[in-house]
Amino acid sequence: SGSCEVKTCWRAMPPFRKVGNVIKEKFDGATEVEMQRIGTRKQLVPKNPQFKPHTDEDLVYISPSPDFCIRDMKAGVPGTAGRHCNRTSKALGGCELLCCGRGFHTAEAELVERCSCKF
């Protein structure tokens, strides 16, 4: 008589927040690189020679992201001037971040609406 053993292995994704944190960390430490010919091969090397060479685990980029604060329709960036923002928020829609340090104007408005409330 023989015995049979079944072994099942699987991999699971870590929590989404953990994945996001790792990507953000890599983004913050990303290195701008350029293509250089070294001998007969082309290689990506840091644009700033003071930076250490990147590893396979590092995030690199060839051209910097556009300045999303400034309007650049060629790059498809509408800019942030004139947008409404949340004065009390410190998050993405907050005025401090959305207005890119240009300052902002506040305005208060009172809105009176008729509603079909039944009590």
UniProtKB/Swiss-Prot annotation:
The keyword Disulfide bond applies. Keywords: Developmental protein, Disulfide bond, Extracellular matrix, Glycoprotein, Lipoprotein, Secreted, Wnt signaling pathway. Gene3D superfamilies: 3.30.2460.20. Transmembrane segments: none annotated. One of its GO terms (cellular component) is extracellular space. GO terms for biological process: canonical Wnt signaling pathway; cell fate commitment; neuron differentiation. A lipid is attached at residue 1 (O-palmitoleoyl serine). It is found in: Secreted, Extracellular space, Extracellular matrix. Disulfide bonds join 69-100, 85-95. Glycans are attached at residue 86. Belongs to the Wnt family. Ligand for members of the frizzled family of seven transmembrane receptors. Plays an important role in embryonic development. This is Protein Wnt-4. It comes from Eptatretus stoutii (Pacific hagfish). The gene is WNT-4.
